[in-house]
Amino acid sequence: MESTTNPQGKTACLVTFGCQMNKADSERMAGALTHLGYRIVDESDTADLVLFNTCTIRDNAEQKVYSYLGQQARRKQRDPHITLVLAGCVAQQEGEKLLRRVPELDLVMGPQHVNRLSDLLERVAEGEQVVATEPIEILEDITKPRRDSAVTAWANIIYGCNEGCTYCIVPSVRGREQSRTPEAIKAEICELGASGYKEVTLLGQNIDAYGRDIGTNLASLLRFIHNAPGIERLRFATSHPRYFSDELIATCAELPKVCEHFHIPFQSGDNEVLRRMARGYTHEKYRAIIEKIRAILPDAAISADLIVGFPGETEAQFENSLRLVDELEFDALNTAAYSPRPGTPAARWPGQLDDEVKQDRLQRTNRLVAQKAFERSQRYLGRTEQVLVEETNPRDRSQVVGRTRTNRLVFFAGELAKLRGQLVDVQITAARAFSLTGTAS
């Protein structure tokens, strides 16, 4: 096909749905396309190649993908030279069925094939309609990602998931856990430091399960990469309570580059719901982890995920989740109404709740979350916080925005050209639920 045999001067648009893992995958695919000669653009309606990197965690995200894809399919009917690619978790889940649903697609590829994009496009160029969803050993990164930020970067350290949560489709679409070697990870992070990046977030579906397949663990990796030149801050996400060990907590407290922010989903505050979710811990175990973190790192920020309206969840069980939110006082909480995913055990269970019930519980939860986050934010007032400047405030061009070590957004007056990538001491003068305002010291 013309758009892939000679991509020089042609344009490509990547539309990304879902989690940080997907965003990191899109950066790598954008790097591959740039290496091939494509110019990355934001406008999908005029691009020569359009790639959708998809999410299947919830039904509304999946339906949004099909809506966008339908628009591009109609466009391709008018202009056959366009190349259409569907990547990510929807591609992995649906596979060849997508070609029957959207015959205009040129390439369907699962998350494990991200680093093979260039090779797969060569097959498309030869006239083949390609489906790449078979399980493979994930190739080590061979193409430099085209990163969206010049200050902060993501680095995947473990792919896949070995858990069996009854509501979750991720293990079947991202495969079994595959850890990258510590040496490969450190090489990538050292390269980021040499390129001027200041902060790296290590990524994995269950990041604290890192190394189980290669005889190491996340605490050891953090110690191994900690001295990477140029890198000022390290973060990691997303953690599973089952693997958040005392050793990991102690290591985070010991290493000055590791930020005091931990994202540890709990999903429910009721033990019976947790059992049916197959999460592998109790709410008491979860509370103990948070207590240990705050005992060693009193100012640590904790964020989490919560699902309301799981099949069979009673009002009393939901109130147990509210009680946990109230008592643990999270700095941020991602909330979602349960969405049945085809192929998961919970989707087939009786006791599916009405949407009205789920939405009512979601709204009640979100009101409490905002209240608690606002209360937590007040501790910053009058303090001086070190802020890593990332970009201009899109709502006020006279301000820049960055993040504290605890991942709070901070807005203050300044010029991005002078401050981007700098660590600036900012005195906090106003505190909202999820952001702060201050004055540079």
From Swiss-Prot:
GO BP: tRNA methylthiolation
EC number: 2.8.4.3
Name of the protein in its database record: tRNA-2-methylthio-N(6)-dimethylallyladenosine synthase
MTTase N-terminal domain: residues covered: 10-126
Statement: the UniProt record of this protein carries the keyword Iron: yes
UniProt keyword annotations, A-Z: 4Fe-4S, Cytoplasm, Iron, Iron-sulfur, Metal-binding, S-adenosyl-L-methionine, Transferase, tRNA processing
Subunit structure: Monomer.
Entry binding sites for [4Fe-4S] cluster 2: 161, 165, 168
UniProt enzyme class: transferase
Organism lineage: Bacteria, Bacillati, Cyanobacteriota, Cyanophyceae, Gloeobacterales
UniProt main location, coarse: cytoplasm
Cofactor dependency: [4Fe-4S] cluster
PANTHER family named in the record: CDK5 REGULATORY SUBUNIT-ASSOCIATED PROTEIN 1, MITOCHONDRIAL TRNA METHYLTHIOTRANSFERASE CDK5RAP1
HAMAP family referenced in this protein's UniProt entry, alphabetically: tRNA_metthiotr_MiaB (MF_01864)
Entries under SMART domains matching the protein: Elp3 (SM00729)
